[in-house]
Amino acid sequence: MKILIDENMPYAAELFSGLGEVIAKSGRTLTADDLIDVDALMIRSVTKVNAELIEKANKLKFVGTATAGMDHVDQALLKEKGIFFTAAPGCNKVGVAEYVLSCLMVLAQQHGFSIFDKTFGIVGAGQVGSYLAQCLDALNISYLLNDPIKEQEGDSRSFVALDELLEKSDVITLHTPITRDGEYPTHHLIGQKTLSKLRNDQILINAARGPVVDNQALKQRLLKQDGFKAVLDVFEFEPDVDMELLPLLSFATPHIAGYGLEGKARGTTMIFNFYCEFLKRNERADPQTLLPIAPIPNVTLNQQWDHSTLHNLIQLVYDVRKDDAVFRKEIATVGAFDKMRKDYWDRREYSAITITGTQCCDLTPLQQLGFTIEEV
């Protein structure tokens, strides 16, 4: 049995090698010839699974993507061909939410505001958007939710229309899939018309899919230099990046918002476990058993934490400025976008820090954010 895996999928080689012959290749450059005699294909979001890719896949029975998003896979085609497909929903939700919080903490420090005084507008209330809302609840930060599809499906949460969210939010953070059809397409959801209405004190963050934001229109909006700010982790035509847009962004990163080591381990183990079920085998993997000890010091709190403490804790785990600096330095090099993703450092989640506190400290909000808590 041959199993073709994306070479950038951590822990995949060691897990899948127990099931068959593992072949590791670059996910972005896969061709139809690579799938000849392959039984299973394990990918990430850079691989487009379409008719061209699988035209010679004479033995393919299983495709798994170790990502939450699925827009890179022609699911109808796979179903038609009798090829089982699965994804890893929610695997990256913690990393993306922590990315957003890091961006806002740094911007707050740079521009002299408090995120606790801001209203967040979360566009897309799936796994990532819902987890971010959970984090904001823990910190008692107000937010609005927009997700017309979930609202139509009867989701009991309180939703608002997109126009209302854009008008009333200080921070607009996007967490939708990319869709071009249907009643609520998200392609260029944030386009020229929408961008022209945004206030100069608003912040836009796209850590979803690049084409959700019209990058050309965003560039024109930022050229006004009136205080409006934008953060992009994803780009409309990635791995190509508009080099005129880049200097206008507050932060820019190469599609790594959800690239925490825990999230990648969850994604890999989820599709490994799905594949074992598909094969009717008993093997199962636990991501926690794969993770190394985090090189992050534990923290002791002897008094009640405040906003400054929270800022320091968040930046101790992940400071977006590190990735932003590397991105700006390297992106002009040919192939840099994918290389930065391939060589991405072992970023950890809040759970990698253990916070020890005395009884005088209410650590519940920090625990709800994901930090590991020990009370003495």
From Swiss-Prot:
Q: Where is the signal peptide?
A: none
UniProt-listed PANTHER family: 2-HYDROXYACID DEHYDROGENASE-RELATED
- In the UniProt record, the gene name given for this protein reads pdxB
Active site (catalytic residues)? R209, E238, H255 (proton donor)
Q: Subunit structure, per the record?
A: Homodimer.
Catalytic activity, EC: 1.1.1.290
Report the function annotation for this chain.
Catalyzes the oxidation of erythronate-4-phosphate to 3-hydroxy-2-oxo-4-phosphonooxybutanoate.
Q: Which UniProt keywords apply?
A: Cytoplasm, NAD, Oxidoreductase, Pyridoxine biosynthesis
Query: Can you state which reaction this protein catalyses?
Result: 4-phospho-D-erythronate + NAD(+) = (R)-3-hydroxy-2-oxo-4-phosphooxybutanoate + NADH + H(+)
Q: Which family does it belong to?
A: Belongs to the D-isomer specific 2-hydroxyacid dehydrogenase family. PdxB subfamily.
User: Record's CDD domains?
Assistant: ErythrP_dh
Positions with a binding annotation for NAD(+): Q127, V128, D147, T176, D233, G258
Assigned GO CC terms: cytoplasm
Q: Which domain of life is it from?
A: Bacteria
Spell out the subcellular localization from the entry: Cytoplasm
Enumerate the Gene3D superfamilies for this protein: 3.30.1370.170, NAD(P)-binding Rossmann-like Domain
Quick one: which pathway?
Cofactor biosynthesis; pyridoxine 5'-phosphate biosynthesis; pyridoxine 5'-phosphate from D-erythrose 4-phosphate: step 2/5
Report the record's Gene Ontology biological process terms. pyridoxine biosynthetic process
Q: Which GO terms describe its molecular function?
A: 4-phosphoerythronate dehydrogenase activity; NAD binding; protein dimerization activity
> Which positions in this protein are listed as binding substrate?
S45, T67, Y259
The protein's name is Erythronate-4-phosphate dehydrogenase
